[in-house]
A protein has these predicted regions:
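A broadly conserved sequence feature marking short terminus-proximal activation segments
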Residues: 46-68, 323-325, 353-354, 358-370
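Conserved alpha-helical substructure of the radical SAM core
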Residues: 71-185
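N-terminal [4Fe-4S]-dependent radical SAM core
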Residues: 2-17, 21-26, 45-86, 104, ...
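Radical SAM enzyme [4Fe-4S]-AdoMet core and its adjacent flexible, acidic
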Residues: 211-225, 229, 233-357, 363-367
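Short amphipathic alpha-helices and their capping/turn segments at secondary-structure boundaries
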Residues: 125-129, 182-196, 259-265
Length: 370
């Protein structure tokens, strides 16, 4: 199998892609003719082809060598430098979202709901503060369930982290993902500690229709909106700087409706996720097919409109992001953000193609597992 392929865009622009080094570059049509073994080609591009071949293009794909072991010292170093710890604060939620990953739509749903063990979580937090370097960055994340159902735990961890940080002087940040229906009870906690908030909101009242209250099945839209509006009104600077939104795409909303509602009301561009189609309960497949909407299709419909928001959200659309990522990471203009990227032919890969454990974050769940 060759390591270099030539491809042509719809506008008849020619590119080469070198798979061994994940490198893409724009080429002249004459060079494309040489690649296609056509005759009557400008001799300059014949020489250019020979030069590229001498530098490793148009050869056989190199075999991939995987690292088989991770040294203990690597893991210990990762833990000492871990930039984030995420606490699964609780399995409980005050909402009963139809598409929730903890619900019966999926086979990996949790049958037993419980809160995190606070003493074990505190022990982990103190250990991490003990091993981290003074002045380093450290984010503490709370998720669930709805983490504010177990708000006392959040308060406890914040208090302890601040106490520990009096000595350690870390660049400390708190983050929470919430459905916003309980934030009115914890505004002082969230604002005083400059939480980074990610609010889950699926758009307008119809779009929010799958996010119903556990106790009576009513739509959570107005409770969430009242709380979000209050947060924006009473703490406008905090809201502007520390609050973001995410939404789930389904058959009761659309990419256009989500963007237009959240941007027009809060001047925020939300992230949008389509429903996960893996591990679906066999008995719920029909429901999944009813609810599922392909984001690409919904984005395509949005792009066919004359919405004033199209230029505003352009950079968030899948097509732009994929193209941007491809050229950012696979072109002659690739900006190296990691020195290891320069050593692609010397660094062994992990078979799962992931980062090594705790290199980026650490999770602690309600079963006291890391």
């Amino acid at each position: 199998m060759k390591n270099t392929i030539e491809y042509v865009t719809v506008d008849n622009n020619h590119y080469l892609f070198h798979s061994d080094i994940s490198f893409s570059m724009f080429i002249h049509p004459e060079l494309a003719k040489v690649c296609g073994r056509q005759s009557g080609v400008d001799p300059y591009y014949v020489r250019k082809y020979a030069y590229l071949k001498d530098k490793g293009f148009f050869g056989e794909v190199l075999p991939v060598e995987f690292a088989t072991t991770l040294e203990k010292s690597v893991i210990e170093n990762n833990i000492a430098q871990v930039p984030q710890v995420s606490f699964e604060t609780t399995d409980h939620c005050n909402l009963n979202c139809r598409y929730c990953s903890l619900g019966d739509l999926y086979t990996f749903s949790k049958k037993e709901r419980k809160n995190i063990d606070p003493q074990k979580a505190l022990r982990l937090l103190r250990f991490l503060f003990d091993v981290k370097l003074e002045g380093s960055e450290f984010a503490i994340v709370f998720f669930g369930g709805e983490p504010l159902v177990n708000g006392r735990f959040v308060e406890m961890i914040v208090e302890e982290a601040k106490r520990l940080n009096e000595k350690k002087k870390l660049k400390l940040e708190f983050t929470i993902t919430t459905n916003a229906t309980l934030i009115d009870r914890y505004l002082d906690l969230l604002v005083d500690n400059q939480f980074k908030m990610l609010i889950s909101l699926d758009g307008d009242e119809k779009g929010q229709g799958y996010r119903t209250f556990m106790k009576d099945g009513t739509n959570s839209f107005w409770q969430a909106i009242r709380n979000i509006d209050r947060l924006q009104c009473e703490y406008p600077d905090f809201f502007e700087e520390r609050v973001d939104f995410n939404a789930v795409l389904h058959d009761r909303n659309s990419v256009q409706e989500i963007y237009e509602f959240i941007y027009n009301r809060y001047h925020k561009i939300p992230s949008i996720a389509q429903m996960n189609k893996d591990h679906v309960n066999k008995e719920k497949k029909e429901l999944m097919e009813q609810m599922f909407v392909d984001r690409r299709v919904s984005e395509s419909d949005f792009q066919k409109t004359n919405s004033d928001l199209l230029p505003v959200v352009h950079d968030e659309l899948i097509q732009f992001k994929e193209l941007n990522d491809f050229f950012a990471n696979n072109s002659v203009n690739f900006y190296m953000t990691n020195l290891l990227d320069l050593l692609y032919d010397h660094v062994s890969l992990i078979p799962t193609k992931t980062c090594s454990p705790f290199q980026r974050k650490m999770f602690f769940n309600t079963n006291s597992q890391i």
